[in-house]
């Protein structure tokens, strides 16, 4: 497996050391509660060259099907990327880890068969810009595989998420709990192939939060 850590001064504003360490500790619990199977469903059927944005600690690397020939995994946070590099070494498919943000994907136009966004579109500063960049690197007919938490359709819970968002994004690495990510994907020109909406509690004592999982075609 090829791994690179070419850090950049341009990524300094995307460093969240405390949140990154807290997130890395929480991922194991999330995975045991069902996040692993959610990611597995999102990755099923992918093939060829794949770009994963916001790869985090690399938990998804072992889940890629063998039909994938290469994964370019992008993670701007130094700490999470260091964990991803270690996981890339034991992945079932070739994985290259790069220091890069989703706003500027280091890939040519139309070079990817699929792009994976897993619990990352909640935290990017500009969803529309990131989705436009994803469209740029996808070939015509390429797939965006997504697994994201989104704003609740329940009026009271949705209002609470709206209220919490300004403080939460400062504490949680830019995360917005109130985004309409499915709407943003369709507004960006993608065609939804399949979509599942479900509640998922990341820990036993936390409330169930709305999630979406599916695939969209460029």
Map each language-model feature to its residues.
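Conserved class I S-adenosyl-L-methionine
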Residues: 143-167, 172, 208
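A short acidic, Gly/Pro-enriched loop at the edge of an enzyme's catalytic core
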Residues: 103-115
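A short SAM/SAH-binding and catalytic strip from SAM-dependent methyltransferases
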Residues: 113-126
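Core SAM-dependent methyltransferase catalytic element
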Residues: 196-218
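Short alpha-helix
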Residues: 173-189
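A short glycine-rich, Lys/Arg-flanked "PGG" loop and its adjoining helix->strand segment in the class I
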Residues: 128-143
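Class I SAM-dependent methyltransferase SAM/SAH-binding core
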Residues: 51-104
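Conserved alpha-helix/loop element of class I SAM-dependent methyltransferases that forms part
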Residues: 26-49, 59-63
